[in-house]
């Protein structure tokens, strides 16, 4: 089904497939978005948050203080503003034709169906009654798999378990897990993620986090989540860096070691098209960009080793053209 300009169907399908609007995505800086989309926008800025709108497209950034750079928060297409509704059936048909179908996940309980394209981390909210797409955003806060499943255990149980685990040595933790862990692999994966989430809720913020018993338990649980298939190597590194569980140099090494491709071979927007045939290369590039950003955030914490700083800087220089 075709749509009238200025918002043809390709505008929406491209955003779902690539996570970008005119080349700008949730990781683009304000200046990069301006260079790509122009200066015809409305914007609100305060000390810690910046929100910019280009008609349907919206970008948000955040920072801890006025001395910090703006970090991308999300990119969104506000489809509910359309005069002619965008129907999910039509968009789904176009995405399937292109070879990039979305997956429906549990509804939000507030009148919306939810769909996700996992590799681009794009989520869609759809009105249950009319079938009209309301919002398309990245990164999605919902998805498939154990990390997004409703927990089968209470928050009180999680708190009790991790408060017990934090006082045990590694052997004691292993014995406890062998006694208490679920038998089925899928339920076990959900359980390990639930324990990690429960632990992170108890882990102190600030400079006392690294090296604390809670950070040590969180690192152990990240390893268990990886063994259970909840996290792959790159996702584990992103958790460790993003949650500030290791000193900066060690966190950077974890990110760089998890890079799925070298700088010389990584796919860029200049060399590689978003096609089904290129999906492996595209997704490696996406993962490399996420790891580069996570490593870059560690530079603000004070990475000491010059070689690590140089390698991160080289990846960050590539970041604007990664997929």
Question: What feature does the model see in each segment?
Answer:
Residues 1-323:
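Short helix/turn-capping signatures at newly exposed starts of structured segments
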């Amino acid at each position: 089904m075709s749509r009238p300009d200025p918002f043809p169907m390709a505008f929406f399908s491209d955003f779902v497939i690539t996570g970008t609007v005119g080349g700008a995505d949730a990781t683009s800086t304000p200046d990069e978005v301006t260079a790509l989309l122009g200066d015809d926008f409305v914007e609100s800025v305060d000390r810690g948050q910046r929100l910019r709108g280009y008609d349907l497209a919206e970008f948000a950034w955040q920072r801890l203080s006025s001395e910090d750079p703006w970090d991308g928060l999300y990119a969104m297409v506000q489809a509910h503003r359309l005069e002619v509704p965008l129907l999910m059936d039509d968009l789904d048909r176009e995405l399937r034709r292109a070879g990039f179908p979305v997956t429906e996940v549990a509804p939000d309980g507030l009148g919306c169906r939810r769909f996700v394209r996992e590799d681009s981390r794009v989520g869609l909210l759809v009105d249950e009654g009319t079938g009209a797409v309301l919002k398309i955003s990245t990164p999605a806060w919902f998805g498939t798999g154990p990390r997004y499943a409703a927990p089968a255990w209470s928050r009180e149980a999680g708190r009790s378990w991790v408060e017990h685990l934090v006082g045990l040595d590694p052997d004691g933790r292993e014995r406890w897990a062998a006694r208490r862990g679920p038998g089925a692999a899928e339920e076990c994966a959900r359980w390990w993620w639930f324990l990690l989430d429960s632990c992170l809720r108890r882990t102190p913020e600030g400079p006392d986090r690294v090296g604390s018993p809670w950070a040590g338990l969180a690192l152990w649980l990240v390893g268990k989540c990886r063994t259970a298939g909840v996290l792959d190597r790159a996702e584990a590194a992103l958790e460790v860096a993003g949650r500030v569980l290791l000193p900066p140099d060690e966190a950077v090494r974890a990110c760089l070691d998890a890079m799925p491709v070298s700088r010389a071979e990584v796919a860029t927007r200049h060399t590689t098209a978003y096609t089904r045939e290129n999906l492996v290369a595209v997704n490696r590039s996406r993962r490399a960009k996420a790891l580069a950003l996570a490593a870059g955030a560690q530079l603000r914490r004070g990475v000491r080793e010059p070689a690590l700083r140089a390698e991160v800087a080289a990846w960050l220089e590539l970041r604007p053209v990664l997929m």
